[in-house]
Amino acid sequence: MKPDRGQVAKWLGAPTDQVGSVNDPRTAEDHGVKWNEMWVYKLPELGFDRVVLWNRYDLLGVWRVFPGGRTEPEKLPEA
């Protein structure tokens, strides 16, 4: 079972920025998935940023974004 929004917020804390919203009907596509809300975590001390993509209340995935644009999926603990 995928974690819900509350669990992700508990694990990762509050995002630095947010793009879109749970109720936004517009979608975008990144990392091979269509999403309508992105949580952005600026983490210069770790050498990467983190993005969490949602489609409404469904978690689509978490990615590390490195300088230069390289990305890699990141695993979260199971709910």
Where are these regions (language model features)?
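Residues within mature, well-folded domains
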Residues: 1-79
